[in-house]
Amino acid sequence: MKYKIEPLYLDKCPETYTGYPQAVTTAGFCFISGMVPLREDGETLTRASELTMEPPSEKPLSVHTAVVEEPIRSQSWWCYSKIESILKSRGGDLNDVLRSHIYQKYKRHYSTHEAVRTIKTGKTPPPSSGIGVLDTSPDGLAWITIDGIAIDPENWPFGSRRSVIKNPGIIESTSHYSRAVSAGPYIFTSGHIPINTAAPGKPLVRDYEDVPEEGRLLKVGRSHTDSVNGPIAAQ
């Protein structure tokens, strides 16, 4: 079966690169382009006063200074709000997001983004991957870019929409995200960070000794090869 791909252009949503749509729909899905937080004049947004939608509620600052925290809060809010606008234009909302990728310039400030995400997506956020990158915008001022896959509510051919798969056997994560969701006959899983959930504090898996014996098939002994390949193979 051949599906038609339809581009979506959102009013009052600046194009990061001229001519590229904010999303495309096909086969019941909505594929959302990377949302770089921009002002209406096309420049990178850096503070709440530049938002055209309702800004995030004011909260006491964390250990970060306002200079560092304000761009992160505002840009995160902008990204989620624009994704929400795309889905609302199709009769849906953020609960229809099945998978997202969060590209971050400074992962050490992730907690600031997480506070915004909690407000926007509630207790059942979609499976996601947090990815550290060198840059997320041409001018270097954007801290975050978010893209995703969602249901296209206007053309979803199945009765069931997104449902969180609750399985206590699924490995824990380092942050609060759904491990997997189902939608119709499809399953979407989150990115998995290699952590040792059996150890206190759930530390990162770093070497062969952190995994069961059957996972040490590339190990040859205490050698330079092991010190180089160990973390990669174990993770």
Placement of each model-derived feature along the sequence:
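N-terminal presequence-like segments and the immediate start of the first folded domain
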Residues: 1-81, 85-234
